[in-house]
């Protein structure tokens, strides 16, 4: 689905099914999480990784999954913050001065906590938000096959 059809959501669903099979390598769950994020479904990535983490007894694998789970939570939170910034801008015709302005009716109930113990940093001039602890957003760096006309 990913390479041939460019359908990240179907690819993520298929990969998640494969990751849930007995004996499946944990790398499948990590890839499925990235695909869910790529398909604009970071919440599904969080759910999948939390499930695999809970079912895994190998401590090394659990450590790896915990990092990926936290990265998925960061991605989910960043998208939530970006959406709230867009709603704020649509309502007030300007960007918020700070993230705290996003807490209120129609926006956010509260600001999310950065799971690595850092902060979510906001650049009011550009409207960008990032984690102080995660250098890069979750992306899949692989090129897709070119579609034939």
Which residues are covered by each model-predicted region?
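Low-complexity, acidic interaction segments enriched in glycine
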Residues: 1-21, 27-149
């Amino acid at each position: 689905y990913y390479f041939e059809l460019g359908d990240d959501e179907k690819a993520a669903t298929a990969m998640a099914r494969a990751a849930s099979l007995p004996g499946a390598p944990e790398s499948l769950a990590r890839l499925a999480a990235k695909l869910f994020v790529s398909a604009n479904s970071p919440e599904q990535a969080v759910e999948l990784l939390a499930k695999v983490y809970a079912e895994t007894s190998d401590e090394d694998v659990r450590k790896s999954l915990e990092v990926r789970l936290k990265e998925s939570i960061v991605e989910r939170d960043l998208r939530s913050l970006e959406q709230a910034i867009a709603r704020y801008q649509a309502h007030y015709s300007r960007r918020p001065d700070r993230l705290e302005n996003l807490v209120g009716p129609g926006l956010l109930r509260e600001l999310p906590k950065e799971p690595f113990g850092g902060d979510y940093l906001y650049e009011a001039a550009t409207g960008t938000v990032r984690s102080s602890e995660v250098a890069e957003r979750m992306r899949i760096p692989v090129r897709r096959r070119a579609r034939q006309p």
